[in-house]
Swiss-Prot record:
Its EC number is 3.4.11.1, 3.4.11.10. Presumably involved in the processing and regular turnover of intracellular proteins. Catalyzes the removal of unsubstituted N-terminal amino acids from various peptides. NCBIfam families: PRK00913.1-2 (NF002073), PRK00913.1-4 (NF002074), PRK00913.2-2 (NF002075), PRK00913.2-4 (NF002077), PRK00913.3-5 (NF002083). Transmembrane segments: none annotated. CDD domains: Peptidase_M17. SUPFAM superfamilies: Macro domain-like, Zn-dependent exopeptidases. This is Probable cytosol aminopeptidase. One of its GO terms (biological process) is proteolysis. The keyword Manganese applies. PANTHER family: CYTOSOL AMINOPEPTIDASE, LEUCINE AMINOPEPTIDASE-RELATED. Keywords: Aminopeptidase, Cytoplasm, Hydrolase, Manganese, Metal-binding, Protease.
């Protein structure tokens, strides 16, 4: 695995060795501190001129330093318009800066801009972007080519010079806990399914106990007793036993109702008897991206000691087509008592979530439930890979989620729910069917889930296009993005902590 850079914060000082990184605004503006760190204003101007560098957000330029100062390289990083920078922008700046460190073991970032004071949380966001950019998943590479993309062989020591290093350091303690959560989610999604089955995933979740998270794991026997016929119907085609993991973080007074997050955890999805095409099926190791995000979120909340009571529940199964597998036409009874006709065994995620959602609502009676799932290809057709689909029965919760997405760059787009769509999942033989056909596929899937949350405020995030295989950016370079951890941490931080 990649080595995380060691990051510290200090007052402004001239860099003594390694890489000197300075910020430049759109149009070429820079602070006096940047000029000092680069060896003079003319040097910055010259590097920008010969590189065609304009200071656009996330763009970089560099020059080898040949003086006896001890600095090996000067890097300019564009920040765009300083007055318009948000959380996601600082992550991009940090990621872009880290990408230019190369093999250097030391780097100094001078965090100063003209006529602008950079706050501690902005410095922490930049540092978070550096950590996330440093991430690689190379656990199974026996020969690693570190020169392939210029990333360092060793963990870089990075000093960030900022006006208020004490505040930045405190903000970074929170940001680093969030980084831990994102990286855990990425690791889980990247892990191959022959290594990470339901049992192994549950064991990874149990490691959160050392952070103070209470963990409970239900096996097949316990789920049968609870009547979870929908989840168990999916699992019956695999020799690997299912698990339901309950994670509890108590960071507020015990009488406060918890917030709840539920994740789809299909560790590998062949489609079952309604088997998928072979091409691209290898990506279905990531069909547990929702469960990975919920696990990563619980790690982040516990790591930063969030002042909230939070529940994370993940349903872990493997969808396989053996002789005991669920068939199209089967009818299963969910924990809620509602019956479901299985039209398509490849619409399995909603069956897993049906029981997980009802269990969460019935046992914990939370303030709200948010579920995450790589649920439908239809949402990718509608929104591509830059927004996750948002469905909700509560406008206030939907607005809060949308705003958190805009702030973090983990963007959402709300799609409709309605009685017309709900009628499409009615069945002639059961209370409902698990697939209504091609039209409005992501909407009818959401309507299905809505039948299992009662009157509780609820939102469904369809992350099929964003949790895995989404386009690389300045701070996410691997197949798994860790989507959802930063989004939901921000939601909790802004609205639900005491």
């Amino acid at each position: 695995m990649s080595k995380r850079p060691s990051i510290s914060f200090s007052d402004f000082a001239a860099p003594e060795k390694g890489v000197s990184i300075v910020l430049v605004a759109k149009g070429g503006g820079f602070a006096d501190e940047a000029a000092q760190a680069a060896g003079g204003a003319e040097k910055i101007k010259r590097i920008a001129e010969i590189s065609g560098f304009t200071g656009a957000l996330g763009k970089t330029a560099e020059a080898i330093e040949t003086t006896s100062s001890g600095v090996d390289k000067i890097v300019l990083v564009g920040v765009g318009e300083p007055g318009k920078l948000g959380n996601d922008d600082w992550l991009k700046i940090g990621g872009a800066a880290f990408s230019r460190i190369g093999k250097a073991e030391r780097a100094t970032v001078t965090l100063a801009l003209p006529e602008t004071t950079i706050a501690g949380d902005e410095a922490a966001d930049l540092a978070l972007g550096m950590i996330l950019r440093s991430y690689k998943f190379e656990r199974y590479k026996t020969r690693k080519n570190n020169e392939e993309n210029g990333d360092p062989k060793h963990a870089a020591k990075i000093s960030i010079c900022v006006a208020d290093p004490h505040t930045a350091k405190r903000a970074f303690e929170v940001a680093e806990a969030v980084a831990d959560g994102v990286i855990q989610a990425r690791n889980l999604v990247n892990e191959p399914a022959n290594i990470l089955g339901p049992v192994e995933f549950a064991q990874e979740a149990e490691k959160l106990e050392k952070l103070g998270v209470k963990i409970e794991v239900l096996g097949e026997k316990e789920m049968k007793k609870l009547g979870m016929g929908a989840l168990l119907g999916v699992a019956q085609g695999s020799v690997r036993p299912p698990r339901l993991v309950i994670m509890e973080w108590q960071g507020a007074k015990s009488k406060e109702k918890p917030v709840a997050f539920v994740g789809k955890g299909v560790v590998f999805d062949t489609g079952g008897i309604s088997i998928k095409p072979a091409a691209g099926m290898e990506d279905m190791k990531g069909d547990m991206g929702g469960a990975a995000a919920v696990t990563g979120l619980m790690r982040a909340l516990a790591g930063r000691k969030a002042k909230v009571n939070a529940i994370g529940i993940i349903g872990l199964v493997e969808n396989m087509p053996d002789g005991n597998a669920q068939r199209p036409g089967d009818i299963v009874t969910s924990m809620s008592g509602q019956t479901i006709e299985v039209i398509n065994t490849d619409a399995e995620g909603r069956l897993v979530l049906a029981d997980a959602l009802h269990y969460t609502n019935d046992r914990f009676k939370p303030r709200f439930i948010i579920n995450l799932a790589t649920l439908t290809g239809a949402v990718m057709v509608a929104l591509g890979q830059y927004h996750a689909g948002l469905f909700s029965n509560d406008d206030e919760l939907a607005d809060q989620l949308y705003d958190a997405g805009q702030l973090t760059g983990e963007k959402l787009w709300r799609l409709p729910l309605g009685t017309e769509y709900d009628k499409m999942i009615d069945s002639k033989f059961a209370d409902m069917k698990n697939s209504a056909g091609r039209y409005g596929g992501s909407i009818t899937a959401a309507q299905f889930l809505k039948r299992f949350v009662g009157e509780t405020a609820w939102a469904h995030l369809d992350v099929a296009g964003t949790a895995m295989g989404s386009p690389a950016n300045e701070y996410s370079q691997t197949w798994a993005s860790g989507y959802g951890v930063r989004l939901l941490d921000r939601l909790v931080r802004d609205h639900f902590e005491s």
